[in-house]
Amino acid sequence: MEVLKGKVDCLPEETGYDSSRIEALNAHFERLIDKEIIHGAVYTISHKGKIIANASLGRGSAISQAQMQPDTVFPIASITKLFTTVAMMQLIEDGYVRLNTPVAEILPQFAEPPFNGITLWHLLTHTSGLYPDGGCFPESAPMNSWGLIDAAYRLWNGEGEFDWVKAGISGGLRRPVGSEWQYNSFGFVLLGEIISRISGQDVHDYIMQKVVNPLVMQDTGFAITQDMARRMFIRNEQWKEMMDAIIAGKPLQRDNSFWSKIPSTGGGLHSTTNDLIRFANMMLNYGCLDGNRILGRKMVERMATQQLHNVPDYCWGANEPNRLYGIGFDMRQGLDYTYSQGTYMHEGAGASSIDIDPKEQLAAVWFVPWDKGEWCPDPLYNVQNIIWSGLL
């Protein structure tokens, strides 16, 4: 299978990395493609601040034989939450709020029990107690925030402005605040609204101006440019039609409903592995990249520090008595992983992963679109093990 190689800064051996493990990585991806587990793969690996690998193989479309490219653009899904987290941390650094600021100080819908004990920290660590994403638990789907919003909108009499925040939390809490880790994307949507209200600026514009643009992430955005559309992974016919319209310069139908007012800060960004590796290296450099300061060193250290203690996790069949989680970042450890203690990461549905190891100064980002549409560990956990096996 042909492997297309992108631009690198140096050979792997120049940073103390065994290049034969890159070949092992390609072989692993080829096996997964042959088994129809993934359509293709694209990845970027950085070691000691230098890009040592950027390559792609397999298909860059779910509906054609178009080849995956080293600069393929894709939806990064929940990796978006890291950008939302950084934006929130910037506002904390600027003195507007603190991690333990009650959400009710910004969103009055949280002023009454049982919501009044929820802080920004709880939203950032998935411990607010709000009902989690659908699929986390068999019984959670009826209480999903999006379903609650939709149901409330159908009953809305049209007077005033529809309160999607109130509707989204109308199911109450599944667990007491701070008592259990439950993956909650809606919490990051709420953080997006909070960022907008604190900054006085649309949160999408804020993230682009304060995080994405200073990092010179030219292929990253909530909106899809013509150039991005030309290189977008095509997941279905409807997606192809949308990309074709963007390429042709045709205006997309504007969504003027209340849905368009809800922030896309839980999973709305598109990017490339090369752009995301710049974000990873900013974190490894304690908030700075190429002379541009995004965050201060102490804030990066706080984000990458284990936050939870004896807080259990039962999502998706887990049975962890002590969930390892930072601020915005997953810090999971266990037999599935070989990265260093203190590594922080995040997955994106569909699937993608960004893994950052401060001890080894190693970062990796990869996109592996599911072929059959079902999550499995081989394109994620196994890939991490192969990449980290190259350290000399």
Describe each region flagged by the PLM:
Residues E2-K5, P114-T338:
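Short, surface-exposed loop or secondary-structure junction motifs
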Residues D18, K81, T272:
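Short, conserved phosphate/pyrophosphate- and ester-handling motifs at nucleotide-, phospho-/glycolipid
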Residues R31-T44, I63-L123, R175-F186, S264-G267:
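Short active-site loop at a secondary-structure junction
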Residues I52-A53, I354-D355, Q361-W370:
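Short, well-ordered beta-strand elements
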